[in-house]
C-alpha cells in the first residue's frame, strides 16, 4: 500500500489489520451522481451456484474493467463508466498502484445484503488489498471469523463516502459481510476495487 497514514488501522490481532478512511470531498457523489450510477444497475440480478443449484444474488452486481470470477463462475466485465472511473484512479494513487478492476453492487431495502465470505484471491495480483467504497444509505459492514461459540465479529458503519481496506492476509482469516435488516429501507451502492491479473 502507498499512503497508509491516510487511513485509520484497526488491530484485529495476530498482526492483522483492517483500515478505514473517507473519500476526499471532490470524489463524494451528490444526489444527481448517485441517481446516475443507480441507473447503471443491470436489469436482472445475477445467479450463482450454491451446492450445485443456481441461487439469485440478493442485490444487483456488475464488474467493470476486468472480469470477476467467483464460485467457479465468471462475471464478464464492461468498460469502466466515466462516473466511477475517478474512484479507480484515486485508489491506484492512494492505496495500491496495481488496482485495476471494479465490482459495483446496488442494494435496495431490507432484502438486499451480502453474506459472510472471503474474497477469492486466485486471480488477484500478489499483495493487492481489497478496497470498498460506500455511497448512500448507511449499512453495517461486518468482519467475522470462527463458528459457534468461537465466532468473533466486529462491526463498522459503512456511511456515505466511507472507504474500507482489507489487506490480503486479513481476507484470508476474516470473512466480511453486509447483513440484512428490516431497518434498511433506502438505497446503497458499494464500489469494490481489486487488482487482477490480465490476460486470463
Task: Locate each region found by the language model.
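Non-heme Fe(II) oxygenase metal-center motifs and adjacent flexible, charged/small-residue loops
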Residues: 1-200
Amino acid at each position: 500500500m502507498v499512503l497508509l497514514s491516510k487511513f485509520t488501522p484497526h488491530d484485529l490481532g495476530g498482526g492483522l489489520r483492517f483500515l478505514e478512511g473517507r473519500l476526499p470531498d471532490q470524489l463524494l457523489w451528490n444526489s444527481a451522481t448517485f441517481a446516475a450510477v443507480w441507473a447503471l444497475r443491470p436489469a436482472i440480478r445475477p445467479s450463482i451456484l450454491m451446492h450445485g443449484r443456481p441461487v439469485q444474488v440478493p442485490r444487483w452486481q456488475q464488474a467493470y474493467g476486468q472480469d470477476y470470477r467467483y464460485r467457479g463462475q465468471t462475471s464478464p466485465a464492461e468498460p469502466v463508466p466515466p462516473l466511477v472511473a475517478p474512484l479507480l484512479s484515486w485508489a491506484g494513487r492512494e492505496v495500491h498502484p496495481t488496482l485495476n478492476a471494479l465490482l459495483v453492487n446496488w442494494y435496495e431495502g431490507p432484502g438486499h445484503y451480502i453474506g459472510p465470505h472471503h474474497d477469492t484471491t486466485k486471480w488477484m495480483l500478489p499483495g493487492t488489498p481489497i478496497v470498498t467504497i460506500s455511497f448512500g444509505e448507511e449499512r453495517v459492514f461486518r468482519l467475522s471469523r470462527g463458528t459457534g461459540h468461537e465466532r468473533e465479529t466486529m462491526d463498522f458503519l459503512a456511511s456515505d463516502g466511507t472507504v474500507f481496506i482489507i489487506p490480503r492476509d486479513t481476507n484470508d482469516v476474516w470473512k466480511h459481510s453486509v447483513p440484512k435488516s428490516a431497518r434498511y429501507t433506502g438505497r446503497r451502492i458499494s464500489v469494490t476495487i481489486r487488482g487482477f491479473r490480465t490476460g486470463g
